[in-house]
From Swiss-Prot:
Superkingdom of this protein's organism: Bacteria
Pfam families reported for this sequence: Cytidylate_kin (PF02224)
HAMAP family reported in the protein's UniProt record: Cytidyl_kinase_type1 (MF_00238)
Species this chain originates from: Pasteurella multocida (strain Pm70)
NCBIfam families per the UniProt record, alphabetical: cmk
The protein's enzyme class: transferase
Protein's UniProt name: Cytidylate kinase
Length: 227
C-alpha cells in the first residue's frame, strides 16, 4: 500500500468534501473512496434489519458482513447494498444521524477499517472521510483537511434541500450539524481532527472552484503530477 498514491480528504459534514473528492478523482484519474458512505450504508442496513443503534457487537457483525459496491455511473458514484441501489436512501437526514451514532463504536470502526484500506488501487486513490489521514491511511502521500463554519455548512444544506423542493428548518439543521460535530470531534476512537501533516483548507468564504484549484496546486507540488 505504501507504493500506491493515496490522497486523503478529511473534514466535517457539509464542508464540501464529496464535491472536492469527485473533482480530484476525475481530474487525476484516481479511484474514489467515500468512507462516509460506508458508515451510512452500515447505518441503513441497521435501520432496515432493526439492529439497535446502541448495540456495538451487533453493529460490528453487520458491518463485517456488508455486501456493498461503489460503481461510477452518470457522473456520480452509485452505491449498492445487497445489489440494491441505495444512493438516495443513504443521503437522508435520518441515515446521516444514524451513521454518526454508529461511527462512535470502536468495534464498528475496526470492522470497516480493512474494508476501506482494500480500496487502495494501482492507479491512485482519493479517500474521503473523517479519519482517512489519521487512522485509515496514515502514510498517505498527500493529506487535506477541508473545513467550514457550522453556519456556512448549515446554509449549504438548507439550500440543497430547497433546490430539491424539500422544506427545511435552518435552525434545526444548524443544531444538528453542531451536535454531529461534537460527537465526531469528541468520540474516544478516531476523533475528527486534521492530521499533523495535513493542509487545512477553510472553504467558508471560497467557491468550490477555488477549493479545487488550491487542492490541485498543492497535490501537484507534492506529487509532481499534472491534472
Amino acid at each position: 500500500m505504501s507504493n500506491k498514491i493515496v490522497i486523503t480528504v478529511d473534514g466535517p459534514s457539509g464542508a464540501g468534501k464529496g464535491t472536492l473528492c469527485y473533482a480530484l478523482a476525475e481530474k487525476l484519474g484516481f479511484t474514489l473512496l467515500d468512507s462516509g458512505a460506508i458508515y451510512r450504508v452500515t447505518a441503513l442496513a441497521a435501520l432496515k434489519s432493526a439492529v439497535e443503534l446502541d448495540d456495538e457487537i451487533a453493529l460490528a457483525a453487520l458491518a463485517s458482513a456488508l455486501d456493498v459496491q461503489f460503481l461510477p455511473a452518470d457522473g456520480e458514484v452509485k452505491i449498492l447494498l445487497n445489489g440494491e441501489n441505495v444512493s438516495g436512501q443513504i443521503r437522508t437526514q435520518e441515515v446521516a444521524e444514524a451513521a454518526s451514532k454508529v461511527a462512535v463504536f470502536p468495534e464498528v470502526r475496526k470492522a470497516l477499517l480493512q474494508r476501506q484500506q482494500d480500496f487502495s488501487t494501482e492507479n491512485g486513490l482519493i479517500a474521503d472521510g473523517r479519519d482517512m489521514g489519521t487512522v485509515v491511511f496514515p502514510n498517505a502521500q498527500v493529506k487535506l483537511f477541508l473545513d467550514a463554519s457550522a453556519e456556512e455548512r448549515a446554509k449549504r444544506r438548507y439550500k440543497q434541500l430547497q433546490n430539491k423542493g424539500i422544506s427545511g428548518n435552518f435552525d434545526q439543521i444548524l443544531a444538528e450539524i453542531k451536535a454531529r460535530d461534537f460527537r465526531d470531534r469528541n468520540r474516544a476512537v478516531a476523533p475528527l481532527k486534521p492530521a499533523e501533516d495535513a493542509l487545512i483548507l477553510d472553504s467558508t468564504s471560497l467557491s468550490i472552484e477555488e477549493v479545487i484549484a488550491q487542492a490541485l496546486s498543492y497535490i501537484q507540488q507534492h506529487l509532481d503530477i499534472k491534472a
